[in-house]
């Protein structure tokens, strides 16, 4: 009987951890806290965003940034964000961090979006902290000025 209970518990854990693990990790052991967009700047026909956050976990490697873009009367879009570290894997020490310039690509890029005033942007920064799953940090939403 005891062996069966251990086997059932192992199966439940094996099925639950990959599903619930990322959500639990983000709440209990986040990579970034107090993250917010602290500035926007119009550069040509793009908007550049600057971000401030408190870095908590130095072992996590930066992967990329994705933006969820919501515009009035249009379907929600997702775009890979251009950052100074695009294409590079980096890790920063714990403490207050300033990040940017982050730019959402413009058309004709397939991910391109015209960032008009009133557009709502939410950034998702992806980190690799271990081999089980990627860890996400959410920043925003913020309204484009």
Explain the meaning of each model-derived region.
Residues 56, 84-131:
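Short, solvent-exposed, Trp/other aromatic-anchored flexible loops in extracytoplasmic proteins
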Residues 1-23:
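Hydrophobic membrane-insertion alpha-helices, especially the h-region
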Residues 20-44:
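Short, compositionally biased P/S/T/A/G/V-rich stretches that sit at domain boundaries
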Residues 30-37, 59-62, 118:
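A broad structural signal for short, well-ordered beta-strand segments within beta-sheet-rich domains
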Residues 27, 127-145:
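Short beta-strand elements
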Residues 42-45, 72-74, 108-120, 145:
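A short, structured loop/turn motif at beta-sheet edges
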């Amino acid at each position: 009987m005891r062996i069966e209970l251990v086997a059932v518990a192992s199966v439940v854990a094996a099925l639950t951890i990959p599903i619930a693990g990322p959500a639990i990790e983000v709440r209990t052991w986040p990579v970034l806290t107090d993250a917010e967009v602290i500035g926007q700047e119009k550069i040509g026909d793009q908007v550049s965003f600057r971000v401030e956050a408190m870095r908590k976990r130095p072992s996590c490697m930066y992967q990329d940034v994705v933006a969820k873009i919501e515009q009035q009367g249009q379907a929600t879009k997702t775009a890979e964000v251009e950052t100074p570290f695009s294409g590079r894997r980096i890790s920063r020490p714990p403490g207050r961090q300033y990040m940017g310039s982050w730019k959402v690509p413009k058309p004709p890029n397939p991910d391109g979006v015209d960032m008009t005033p009133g557009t709502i942007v939410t950034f998702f920064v992806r980190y690799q902290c271990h081999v089980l799953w990627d860890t996400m940090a959410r920043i925003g939403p913020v309204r484009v000025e």
